[in-house]
Amino acid sequence: MHTRMRRLVAGLLLAGASVSPAPVTAPAQVLDDPAVGAPGLGDPYYPDDGNGGYRVEHYDLTLDYDPPNRQLAGIARLSAIAAQPLRAFELDFNGPEVRAVTVNGRPALFERTGAHKLAVSPLLPLLPGLPFAIAVDYAGQVTDTPDSGWTVSPSGGAFAAGEPHSAATWYPLNDTPLDKATFEVRVTVPQEWEVVSNGLRTRDVADGTHRTVEWRLRDPVAGYLTTVAIDHFEFLEQRRADGTPLFSAFAPQAVSRRELENRLPEILDFLETLYGPYPFETGGGIYVDTDLQFSLETQTRPIYAPWTDLNTVVHENTHQWWGDSMSVTQWSDICLNECFASYTADYLWPERKEGKDVDRMYRETVDKYRDDPDFWSIPLQNPGAGREFTVVYTRGPLFLHALRHLLGDAIFFPAMSRFVQAHRYGNAAMPEFRSYLQTLTPIALGGFLAAWLDGTTPPPDSDLFPGTLSLG
């Protein structure tokens, strides 16, 4: 994510092996009934998010949307595997009215509970280790939820975007980064509208009155990184030198951003030099003309607000490595996403592509904010619920630049690439990252990491200015 406020602050500051995900299980204390999947996985910030007892392997959505009336009809088909005996389980969903639910083709009892839960009781119990199929039929007017899900655009179209939540406003899912699944969606709209989503477009058929468009994402994705966008788009199709197709869309009032997106092949080439091969089979962007407060790294095809600039495009595409391919384990791990995306866009691109003296920029930033207690008051690791998207954008780049100087470029850059590649299509956590850093050097890093990641005051000079930063 790249917020408008973060963009303003950034502007001032600038003047391995694949890891297989484990079954999703809930903390033991919430399992009151061993045959009922837990309604929430106990994330410290969002304990009700996600659901225990099963793992989703694939989402298959069939949607019909009527923009003038904001009417959405959908059938969500989920392919899942039970992790325990189940006579009941829950999904996350706060979208339109649910009309019917089936499990393995048989009608199931269901009930809407809490703010965003759909409780399901299959006709027959589910056995651990076996696959099962869920189908949810729903329809109704979609609520306009700007910045946190389904959003109506100025043209009357719509798109879905939000972090950490958005997907549950338009389809039922297991809404946790721990349960990533493959994804496909087919959307039918009046013929004059276009539809864009994640992955590759595999079908676009018009019958004279309606258009049906299908998109498929073959690599696993967290729910909040899925999107669908419906508008009178103009398209830009490009290819990288290796043949990777890039598909970008521009809403009617966003076509002026086409020049930015022309640089996407160059941006992805640059990011590969830092973090290894691009992790997906396609890329692109969706440029909306709604007054969003953020841009978002929706997988393969970020959502861009009207104020997007080059820094934003670099930031969101860095997330394809740090945040999308490798996702957080808990939301307290958000520095793994935003610290790296911000450092790459604010420091590495200016340094290597524009010739900026980023050491000088670092020192000037530290001097400017060193005596500002508010700048240091929130820890980088575990910033707290509702504060995830604050200091990771401003202090995050400072931390990584200091770490780079402490380790040296010859260690820092290969090590960061190895870490993100080792967690490709999986999850990582900040405690794991800290332990990994210590394996890179005989220097004891405990004090340095505690000062930067846990502290709420400026680090001591030895940690603020390690290595050649002390020579400025």
Positions of the model-derived regions?
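A surface-exposed beta-strand-loop module
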Residues: 89, 93-153
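N-terminal, polar/Ser/Thr-rich
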Residues: 1-2, 6-7, 22-73, 154-157
